[in-house]
């Protein structure tokens, strides 16, 4: 879910709803789906301003959509091909574009435009770089994507070209957070990695073991504090 001011946005068993944070009252419901095997979303909604219009970006099991946060009106919707609807990562806005990728599909960059009060989206390019569960970080016009193949790659957002792909990494999942030209990656096996956003090569600066059990929860950052939740505990570290 996404907490934004006095609202909570949730993608439940079918569609997306906006709730009052204080009371739990449903403010609106949108994008109702059939439910069942293809209902409900793995992804999380995110707020962004694209082409001058405030958006709630929502990735369902079959499509990436832009909604009006106040009303739930669907501004645009673009199909995203997946295997069994596994759209898991959170879409990432960059300028007036949105990057996403899906299991069993491809990576996509969609551009958002506004003309005569109407907002629309179109696909700018696709790439074979296929993410799985890990939401990419976007730094200086490049996406750093942890792939289904357990490799990290760098994608040029202007062209969709893959600049490099790392050798195989043991972990299935990374959660990543950017800070300037560096980013942190927490592996599901409890390793915290510090990497430089290098468009020429995989650039690992340092890594340490921070957990004794699996760490599937996303990294949480509060100022210079890094919060890491493992199966049976919570740890805090300082990021300098």
Mark where each language-model region is.
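WD40 beta-propeller blade core
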Residues: 17, 65-66, 108, 153, ...
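Blade-level signature of beta-propeller repeat domains, shared across WD40, Kelch, NHL, RCC1
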Residues: 107, 190-191, 212-240
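Loop/turn-rich, solvent-exposed surfaces of beta-rich toroidal or solenoidal domains
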Residues: 106-107, 127-197
